[in-house]
C-alpha cells in the first residue's frame, strides 16, 4: 500500500514538472514568434510606407527575405509551438501541408540570404556594371528563382510522398519505445531527399555566401587602405605646406592617426561580416548536419545503443527551432541600417523619444572630365530623405577628409563614424550608431551641381 502511494506521488510530481516545463516552453516560443512577426512586419511596412526605401533595388532582396521570414512565423512556427506545448500533433492531416510550408519557407529564407550576398558582392566588385545592370527586372528574376526552387523542393516531393522513408522511421520507433501513443508529425525523410534537399537548401548557399563575403572583405579592406593612403597623403601635403610657410620642418611628417583609423575600419568590417555568417551558420548548420545523418540511423539497433548518430526527437526539434530563430535575427542584421532605423522610428511614432543621431552625408560628384568633387553635410535627427533617385557611391570614390569629419563631429558631440563603401554595405555595414550615406550627383564642367 505504501509502495502504491509513493508511486502515485512520483507520478504527480513528474506530471507537475512536465506541465511547468511546457508552460516555460510555451512562453519562450511565444516570445520568439512575436519577435519574428514584429521585426519582419516592420521591415515590410517601412518599405511600403517610405518611397525612398523602395527606390533602392538592393532593398527588394531585403523585402523578399522579410516576407519569407514572416511566412516562417505565420505558417510554420505557431503550429509546431502548439504541438510542443500539447505534447502531440493536434492538427491531423494538415501535417503534410505543414511540412511543405516548413521546407518552402525555410529554404526561401536561406536562398534569399544567398541572393543578398551575391547582390552585394556584385555591387562591390563591379560597381559601374552593377548600377547599369541591376534593374528591378533583374532583381525580380533573382528573387523569382529563389522562390521557385523553394516551391519545387517542397510541395511537389511532399505531396507526391517522395520525401518519406519507406522503412520505419527512427523517430516513430523512438516514440514506440517510450510507450507514447500520440499523433506525430515528425516526418522521416529518405536518404536521397534528405541529402539533395539539404544541398539545395543549405550547403550550396552557405558555400556561395562564404565565398562572396570573403571576397567582399578583401575588396573592402583593400579600398580602406587606398582611402587611408589618400588621407595620409593629403594631410602630409598640408602639413608640409604649413611647415614651409612657418619654416618648421618638424611639422612635415606622416600622420599616424590615419593608420589606426584604417585598421579600426578593417576590423569593423571583419566583425560585421563575421556576425552575418556566424549567426546564420550557428542557427542552421546543426540542423542540416542532423538532417543528413538521421536517415542513416538503423532503428533496429537503437535499443542496443550501438548507433552513435541516432538522437531523440526532442534533441532534433531543439535544433529545428534554432534554425527558425534565424528568421527573428535577420531583420536586426539586414534591415537595421540608418535608413531603416529612421523609418522604424517614424512608424512607431517614437522619433522624438528614440534618439537617432545626425548623419554626416558625403555627396560625391563626378564632372565630365572624370574629376571627383565631394562635399559634406549633416542630416537632422529623425528625418527621412525625400530623394527617390539616390545612387550609392562605388567603393573607388574619395571620401571627406578625416579632419573635416572630426571637426563636424566635435561640434555635434557625436562619436566617430565610419563610411559606407557601396550599396553592398547599405544593409550590413552599419558601423556605428552614426553612419554616412553616399551618393553620386552629376555636375557641370565647372564643378557646380547640375540643376
UniProtKB/Swiss-Prot annotation:
PROSITE patterns: G_PROTEIN_RECEP_F1_1 (PS00237), G_PROTEIN_RECEP_F1_2 (PS50262)
Disulphide bridges: 95-185
GO biological process: adenylate cyclase-activating adrenergic receptor signaling pathway; G protein-coupled dopamine receptor signaling pathway; positive regulation of MAPK cascade; vasodilation
Residues carrying a glycan: 4
Lipid linkage positions (S-palmitoyl cysteine): 350
Membrane topology field: Multi-pass membrane protein
Primary localization: membrane
Tissue-wise expression: Brain.
Domain of life: Eukaryota
Pfam family, one: 7tm_1
Ranges of the Extracellular topological domain: 1-22, 87-95, 163-191, 299-315
TM spans (from-to): 23-48, 60-86, 96-118, 138-162, 192-217, 272-298, 316-340
Cytoplasmic topological domain: 49-59, 119-137, 218-271, 341-451
Cell compartment(s), UniProt: Cell membrane; Cell projection, Cilium membrane
Any Gene Ontology CC annotation: synapse
Keyword Oxidoreductase found: no
SMART domains cross-referenced by the UniProt entry: 7TM_GPCR_Srsx
Function, in words: Dopamine receptor whose activity is mediated by G proteins which activate adenylyl cyclase.
Family: Belongs to the G-protein coupled receptor 1 family.
Protein name from the UniProt record: D(1A) dopamine receptor
Gene that this polypeptide is encoded by: drd1
Amino acid at each position: 500500500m505504501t509502495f502504491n502511494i509513493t508511486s502515485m506521488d512520483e507520478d504527480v510530481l513528474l506530471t507537475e514538472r512536465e506541465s511547468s516545463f511546457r508552460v516555460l516552453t510555451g512562453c519562450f516560443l511565444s516570445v520568439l514568434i512575436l519577435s519574428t512577426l514584429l521585426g519582419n512586419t516592420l521591415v515590410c511596412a517601412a518599405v511600403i510606407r517610405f518611397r525612398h526605401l523602395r527606390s533602392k533595388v538592393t532593398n527588394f532582396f531585403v523585402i523578399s527575405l522579410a516576407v519569407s521570414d514572416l511566412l516562417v512565423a505565420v505558417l510554420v512556427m505557431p503550429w509546431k509551438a502548439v504541438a510542443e506545448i500539447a505534447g502531440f500533433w493536434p492538427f491531423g492531416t494538415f501535417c503534410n501541408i505543414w511540412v511543405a510550408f516548413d521546407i518552402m519557407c525555410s529554404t526561401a529564407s536561406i536562398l534569399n540570404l544567398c541572393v543578398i550576398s551575391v547582390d552585394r558582392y556584385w555591387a562591390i566588385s563591379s560597381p559601374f556594371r552593377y548600377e547599369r545592370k541591376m534593374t528591378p527586372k533583374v532583381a525580380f528574376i533573382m528573387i523569382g528563382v529563389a522562390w521557385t526552387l523553394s516551391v519545387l523542393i517542397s510541395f511537389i516531393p511532399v505531396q507526391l510522398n517522395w520525401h518519406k522513408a519507406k522503412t520505419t522511421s527512427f523517430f516513430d520507433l523512438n516514440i514506440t519505445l517510450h510507450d507514447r501513443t500520440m499523433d506525430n508529425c515528425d516526418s522521416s525523410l529518405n536518404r536521397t531527399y534528405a541529402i539533395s534537399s539539404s544541398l539545395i537548401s543549405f550547403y550550396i548557399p552557405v558555400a556561395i555566401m562564404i565565398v562572396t563575403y570573403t571576397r567582399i572583405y578583401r575588396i573592402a579592406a583593400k579600398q580602406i587602405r587606398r582611402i587611408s593612403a589618400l588621407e595620409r597623403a593629403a594631410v602630409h601635403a598640408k602639413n608640409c605646406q604649413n611647415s614651409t610657410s612657418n619654416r618648421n620642418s618638424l611639422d612635415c611628417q606622416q600622420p599616424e592617426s590615419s593608420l589606426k583609423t584604417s585598421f579600426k575600419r578593417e576590423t569593423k568590417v571583419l566583425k560585421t561580416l563575421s556576425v552575418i555568417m556566424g549567426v546564420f551558420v550557428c542557427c542552421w548548420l546543426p540542423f542540416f548536419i542532423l538532417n543528413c545523418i538521421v536517415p542513416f540511423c538503423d532503428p533496429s539497433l537503437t535499443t542496443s545503443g550501438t548507433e552513435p548518430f541516432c538522437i531523440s526527437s526532442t534533441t532534433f526539434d531543439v535544433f529545428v527551432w534554432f534554425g527558425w530563430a534565424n528568421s527573428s535575427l535577420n531583420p536586426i542584421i539586414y534591415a537595421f541600417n540608418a535608413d531603416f532605423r529612421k523609418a522604424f522610428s517614424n512608424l512607431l511614432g517614437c522619433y522624438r523619444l528614440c534618439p537617432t543621431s545626425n548623419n554626416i552625408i558625403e555627396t560625391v560628384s563626378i564632372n565630365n572630365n572624370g574629376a571627383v568633387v565631394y562635399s559634406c553635410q549633416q542630416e537632422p535627427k529623425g528625418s527621412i530623405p525625400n530623394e527617390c533617385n539616390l545612387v550609392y557611391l562605388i567603393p573607388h570614390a574619395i571620401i571627406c577628409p578625416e579632419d573635416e569629419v572630426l571637426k563636424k563631429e566635435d561640434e555635434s558631440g557625436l562619436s566617430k563614424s565610419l563610411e559606407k563603401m557601396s550599396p553592398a554595405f547599405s544593409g550590413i555595414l552599419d558601423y556605428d550608431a552614426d553612419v554616412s550615406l553616399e551618393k553620386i550627383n552629376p555636375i557641370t564642367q565647372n564643378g557646380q551641381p547640375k540643376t
